[in-house]
């Protein structure tokens, strides 16, 4: 039996997310929602991504979500990219209204790509639409290969799955073949990237995919 209060919260969120999406489309801005657990390397992937898209001549901004502090936004801003910090004050995810309230701080007409770095959590972020075009799920091999079984919604909702810290794979018990089989049955259409933000392994292919997303939305 569904709890009416939760249903109302999600319906209200979805309406605001739809309005956000229309605003993004009206301005020709591609929006990606980056999600992961804390410590998976999400901010490192954001930085590697902004380096790749900037090299392709794409203008962008970043919204960073955290319970507290401006640490991640400060790291992004150091690369000359506009960054807006959202502190949730305890909430384990961003929601569409938080994004709506942050957008006046960003000149959408001046950018082609907006990256939203969600709060580190494997449960709540997948439940709340923000108005994004694609969801990017990041997992590090040090977290273990059983996460899709424990947190299926996050993995089944993802449009792209980035497996980070591949440089440490040999030092873990992560079963890559078994993991890929689970993902293949759970989300057969997801695009998977094996990377290391430390060594640079796999980042060229990831950067090319990101640029492709911006180009495709720009053609609509």
Per-range role (PLM):
Residues 3-35, 40, 44, 49-133, ...:
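Nucleotide-state-sensitive switch-loop elements of NTP-binding domains
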Residues 45, 95, 147-150, 175, ...:
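Residues at alpha-helix caps and immediate loop-helix transition turns in enzyme cores, especially N-
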Residues 65, 140-141, 197:
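Cofactor-binding loop segments of dinucleotide-utilizing enzymes, especially the Rossmann-like FAD-
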Residues 85-88, 139, 164:
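Short beta->alpha connector loops at strand-helix junctions that form conserved
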Residues 125-132, 141-189:
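Conserved C-terminal guanine-recognition region of P-loop GTPase G domains, centered on the G4
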Residues 168-220:
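Canonical P-loop GTPase G-domain recognition
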